[in-house]
Amino acid sequence: MDLINELHQRNLIFHITNENKLKELIKNKYISLYCGFDPTEDSLHVGHLLPLITLKRFQVLGHKPIVLIGGATSLIGDPSFKTKERLLKSDSFVEKCTLKISQQISFFLDFNSNFNSAIILNNNLWFKKINILQFLRDVGKYFSVNALINREAVKKRIKRSDQGISFTEFSYNLLQAYDFFILNQKNQVSLQIGGSDQWGNISSGMHLIHRISKKEAYGLTLPLLMQSNGIKFGKTESGTVWLDPQKTTPYRFYQFWMNIEDSNVYRFLKLFTFIDIHEINEREKNSYKKNQIVSDKVLLAKHMTRLVHGDEKLSAAERITNILFFKNINDIQISDLEQLRKDGVPVVETYKIKDLQEALVLSSLAQSRTQAKNMIISNSISINTKKIVNKNYIIDDNDKLFNQFTLLSRGKKNHCLIYWNK
């Protein structure tokens, strides 16, 4: 199967230019392709995984992936389908973010291959060398303002009475077009990939290459993933799901995939994993069987957590899951409890709680001591996964894991971690 056909079967293609020519090109030679990432935050998030994994799919088959960090363009901000002007970032902030996301990207691609090693570039390399008059003369003259303002992303902003679009953001399209042109000239890049919201920017790059160099370049966009509630993929009630384990713990990351809607399980297995497409289709055919979807969610969560955080962090996420959902606390490690303390479950810090009823109220697992007493009597409360039925139970040192933590649970899904201050 050729790569473009596989991308179609995995539902990875939203737009593609000159598909037959691109198929022929990558069939007959190895190409260089790129995707850009603006360092507007100090971590990538799960929404960035799709383009990174797609770059990897090309690299596995011999093509050379280039990651372009928008050290210059991030100072402007991409207006594509944004409802309002982005806040401008400082140079120092962008530099810090560039370093961090470059380190994250290094885990996804092979930078030590014989002939198609991935490389990371920063568009500061060329934008710091070009002045505004040169840019307007050499780039701006190839673009019609009429065409630019008719781009869907720009039109939406112009039509809003409360939010227009500044010339700063309006110029972003030309800056990204120039990126593609430079990479085509210097690195023989013939394909740019990105989210479907990047179609206008990619098209401008192809246009500029054709006008100046008389060469044909190609574009491929990936679907923007939305949840059924209309919220962008990767956003939860508790915020963005980051790739940085200091911002989203591996356990919380693992649970994000476990909690996706059933209707997305096989779609995401196709989009995000390298599991054979035929195996995924077979799994989907059997999804009516008892526990099959849950089993396949586990497969997805394992694959993604291993990909982003590695085997050790995956094991920790599985241990924590076993504690909270399957009451298996035997293999718990203090680092697992530190993960839970960071963003796994609600946390109460104290040094003086004595009785269980007070602990349940303080942890918000109960609204009152009376309710707490009734919960204990009805066999709903556990300490460190052990059921407690004594309504007058006093918490002591034996209930402290590693002399620092106590896990309170109400039923199967409501937990709170007590952290004992010394």
Swiss-Prot record:
It comes from the Bacteria. SUPFAM superfamilies: Alpha-L RNA-binding motif (SSF55174), Nucleotidylyl transferase (SSF52374). The keyword Cytoplasm applies. L-tyrosine binds at Y34, Y172, Q176. GO terms for molecular function: ATP binding; RNA binding; tyrosine-tRNA ligase activity. One of its GO terms (biological process) is tyrosyl-tRNA aminoacylation. It is found in: Cytoplasm. Keywords: Aminoacyl-tRNA synthetase, ATP-binding, Cytoplasm, Ligase, Nucleotide-binding, Protein biosynthesis, RNA-binding. It holds the Pfam family SYY_C-terminal. Its EC number is 6.1.1.1. Residues 354-412 form the S4 RNA-binding domain. The keyword Transmembrane helix does not apply. GO terms for cellular component: cytosol. Homodimer. Belongs to the class-I aminoacyl-tRNA synthetase family. TyrS type 1 subfamily. This is Tyrosine--tRNA ligase. It comes from Buchnera aphidicola subsp. Schizaphis graminum (strain Sg). The lineage of its organism: Bacteria, Pseudomonadati, Pseudomonadota, Gammaproteobacteria, Enterobacterales. The gene is tyrS.
